[in-house]
Amino acid sequence: MKTIIVFLSLLVLATKFGDAKEGVNQEQKKEVTQNEFRVEYLNEMAAMSLLQQLEAIESALFEKEAGRNSRQKRCNGKNVPCGANHSPCCSGLSCEETFGYGWLYKSPYCVIPSNG
């Protein structure tokens, strides 16, 4: 019987002091969760800022690529039609009417300039 009374008194004391600690623990949990949400919010804001910076860099790179793709076409090589409707001849070649192709296709061709 003495043992049961001791265990019951310990149970009552543990219940009483356990509730007091539980209230303190709940306050600590609230503080921790509020701090975590603040940190998460700040981390999220930093991530959004970083994302905006990356998008700006990406758009700048795409503009450069678009500029590269829209460059003028390459020059025409030897025995290729040239003129107003065609690309210019490469360096070292001139756009001339030739006997071989010009009379048939009615357009000048890129040829090596004649010295004469």
Curated annotation (Swiss-Prot):
Ion channel inhibitor. Expressed by the venom gland. Keywords: Cleavage on pair of basic residues, Disulfide bond, Ion channel impairing toxin, Knottin, Secreted, Signal, Toxin. GO terms for molecular function: sodium channel inhibitor activity; toxin activity. The presence of a 'disulfide through disulfide knot' structurally defines this protein as a knottin. Disulfide bonds join C75-C90, C82-C95, C89-C110. Belongs to the neurotoxin 14 (magi-1) family. 06 (ICK-Trit) subfamily. The keyword Coiled coil does not apply. It is found in: Secreted. One of its GO terms (cellular component) is extracellular region. This is U16-barytoxin-Tl1a. It comes from Trittame loki (Brush-footed trapdoor spider). Residues 1-20 form the signal peptide. InterPro entries: Toxin_22. Residues 21-74 form a propeptide. Its main location: secreted. It comes from the Eukaryota.
